[in-house]
Each structure stands twice: as structure tokens, then as C-alpha cells.
Amino acid sequence: MLIYRRISNFIKRYYKNTYKKFCVRFISTNLEWKPSIGLEIHAQISTESKLFSGGPTNFNHPVNSCVSLFDCAVPGTMPVLNKKCVEAGVLTALALSCEINAVSMFERKHYFYSDLPAGFQITQQRKPLAVNGKIKFNVFRPGLHKESYSKSSKIKQIQLEQDSGRSLHNEVLGRSLIDLNRAGIPLMEFVFEPDLTSGEEAAALVQELCLILQLLGTCSCKMQEGALRVDANVSISKPNAPLGIRTELKNIGSINALNHAIEYEIKRQISILQKGGQVINETRAWNPVNKNTILMREKEDKHDYRFMPEPNLPPLYLHIKRNVQNKYNLIDVPSLKEQLPELPEQIRKNLLQSLTPDTLAAVTSNCDLFLLFCNILKNGKHRDPQLMAKLFISEVLAVMEYHNLNLTFCVNNQKYIEELMDLIQAKVINRPTLRKLVHELVKKPNKMPKQIVEENKWFMISDEKELELICSEILKTNPELVKKYKAGKKRIYKKFLHKAAILTEDCADMVKVSEIMTRLLS
């Protein structure tokens, strides 16, 4: 035992010293160099039709089945602005504290890609929909006990633009195929100032933006479907010096990948500068297999996109004054502002009164989880937030992971999950029964929890007289264990509780069982 303790203490000291050395090295590197990260985010607007045509926006439809004549640039077709897209853009800009421009302009951005049939993209460059916004978010430092700090990032502008098609590369045939289903889908482009300093901050910003967009219903934020695409501009400089030469990171498929890609690029650039080299202005792609960034193309010259006003679209006028009559029936910004729901920052402030910081960090670690949790509380004002969060994370999600299911399954079966939570809060069932019920949900999704409990008689046994009889019987039939317990072997106590759980088929109120067992043994 003494040898074990010495080895254990040695291991603790070793890791403590290693951690200190690593921290000193990391802090000194960070003091010497200052990373600057700016994000450009494209979010597909959740509408049924495209930005300038009546073409549908369905993701899973067969290739080239959602293409209107305008989308494939048939000569003579004209753009017609989708009002719903403008309203979604204004609502998003208001949620991000932006200044809405009363007049914005559409322009043509010329470049040739095979999946851009017109040879130009209709966008907003010089006079966008909104400018000068800000997003606040919490950044959680990695570790067992997640500490957070507050951060904000400035939004330079939000602009509306149309998406391009997709190029599908067939290696077997040795050719590229074009799918124009995505061409013309409405986008909001968010251009952020380079005021972030790490991959963790960038990931936290995107996560917060996803929460806001999903709460507003303006974007699904499904990165796996391309509904949200993030590019990162990374540069390294000395503190208080001008920004260094930047590299642009693309091909980032998830929030986690964004964090890793930026952290890798920061280390790569620092390594180049420490060796006396020079960072090249280039576009790099994140390789998720090798966990590194690879060269896509060098940016030797600045592209001349030949921006020009879109001749087929008039300026976009909005009604922005509150107490002035809207004579021309323009999109009314003040009325849209009144439709804003409670935003994540305010929801977190409210939840902080009911949740511990660790639980709040766990609940807000995933966009889908946070939205589902908010909906569960919204549908039942009587529900205890701390209990709901703990049960959902420790019990429900554990069973989902066991069956290789994701949160979509919980979203689709939200009523079932809510009834489960209500049964346990009302002390109708206990936690082991909750686990059994979640397993039953996966096997038989048509039955509701209360019905299953009634059929199997899984009600929690909480009657003290009944529990005392069970505890007395256990002690009576196990005299040897009682003798060992009274002799000082306190670990045997768990065996008594285990036997009580077996006798009651995991339906006993184990808090009461523990109290009764302790009283009887003393």
C-alpha cells in the first residue's frame, strides 16, 4: 500500500511539473506573438424559394431538379427579390445590434466558375443591408472544471447575396459534374473584424451565432448540409504592431474543425516567423484526416471582381423610423424589432439563477442541445431547470450514445422526453426506471412513458413502512454482513443497498432506503 502511494504521488508530481513547463512555454509564446482572426460566415436563409427566383430550396432533391430559368442564367430572365429573405436579414441584423441601412444596393461581382452560370454573383458590397454590429459570447477554457470569460466581436457588415451551384468531381469518369440546385439560394454573409485571438474564441463565436440564427428561425445552421459555411482569416504579428500577412482557411466542416484549423495555422505561422521566414498570402484548406492545413492556391494579385451596380434591381428601401407613417408599404423595421424573441444571452442570464455554472456550460456546449433544453422548459413552467439538465445530460444522452443515436432522435420524440422528466420530478419513478424507459423509447417509440410504467408496475416504492420491512428482511437474512459492518467494514454498506435494489427490481426510493438502512444498522 505504501509503495502504491509513493508511485501515485510521483505520478502526480511528474504531471504537475510537466503541466507547469508547458504553461510557461505556452504563455511566453503568446506574449511574443499576437494572433488576429477574422471570420467570414455564409448562412443560407431558411426560405421556401430562392433569393431572386421562385426555384425551391430543398436540400435532398435530385441533382438539377430545383433550378429555375433564372438560376441557370437563361438570357432574358430577370431577378425578382424575395421579400422573406430581406425580412430574415433585417431580423438577424437587429438581433446582432447592427445599424440597418435605410437604402441598400445590389451589385454584380464578376468571376468565372463553372458552377456560376451567369459569370457574376449578385451581392451587396459597397452599400450592404446592415453595418456595425456586435456579438457577445462566452469562451470556455478547456479543462475538467470549465472556466469561462466573456468576449465580443465586431461585425463589419451583413449583406444579402445568392449562392453558387456545386461542382461534383467524379474521379472514375475523370470529369467534373455541375449541380445547380444550390445556385440562387439566399445567403447572409457576416463579415467580422479581425478581433479574435484563438480557435476557441472563433468556435465559441460561431456556436453563439448558430444559437441566435436557430432561435430566430432564419437559418438551420446545418454545417453538414452546407447551410453554414465558415472561412477564417488568420495572421500573426508582434503585440502593438500592424496586422501580419494573412492566410485564408477554407473547407472547414464543423465548429470543432474550425478550432483545430485555426490553432494549427497559428502554430504554423509562428514557426515560420521564428525561423526567420515570411508568411505567404494564400488560401489553405483544413485536412480533417491529417489534422493540418494544406495549400489550395496562392493569392499573388488581388482579384478584380469589377463590381458594378445590378442594373435589373432597384435600390432596396426600408422603413426604419418608428413613429413615421409607412406610406409606400416598405418592409417595416420597427415592427420586425418587436418580433424578436428572447436571445441566448438573456436566456443564459435567466438560467444562471437556476443552474450551476458547470451545468450551464454543459447545456450551452451544443446548439441543438441548448434549443431542445429551452423548449422543454418553455413547454412546462413547473419544471426544475437544474434537475432537467442533469437528468437529460447524465441519463438520456448516455442511452442515446449507447444506441448510436444523436439529438435529432430526442427532438423528434420531445413529448416522450418531457413526460419522462415530469414523471421523475413528480417522484412517480426513479432514475434506474428512467433509464429503462429511454431504452424502451428506442425499441417501441409509439408508447408513452406513463403507459409503460402502468403496464410494468414500475412505480417508485416510497412508502416508508414497506421499505422498512424490505430493509429488515435484508439485515435478518445476512447476519454475517451485519457482523462485518459493525466490526468497522463500512464498505459492506453498499451491498445492503444493492440487495434492496434487487429485491424491489430497481423501483425503490434509494434515498429513503439509505436513511432506513442507516437507522436500522445503528
Segments predicted by a language model, with ranges:
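Basic, nucleic-acid-interacting segments
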Residues: 26-342, 348, 354-358, 379-385, ...
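N-terminal mitochondrial targeting presequence
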Residues: 1-32
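Strongly charged, low-complexity linkers/loops
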Residues: 407-418, 428-503
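Amphipathic alpha-helical core segments of compact helical bundles
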Residues: 46, 267, 393-401, 439-443, ...
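M16/insulysin-pitrilysin zinc metalloprotease superfamily fold
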Residues: 382-388, 396-410, 419, 423-424, ...
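Core structural elements
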Residues: 225-238, 350-375, 385-403, 415, ...
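Short, amphipathic C-terminal "tail helix"
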Residues: 490-522
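Residue-level detector of well-ordered alpha-helical segments, enriched
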Residues: 359, 372, 384-392, 416, ...
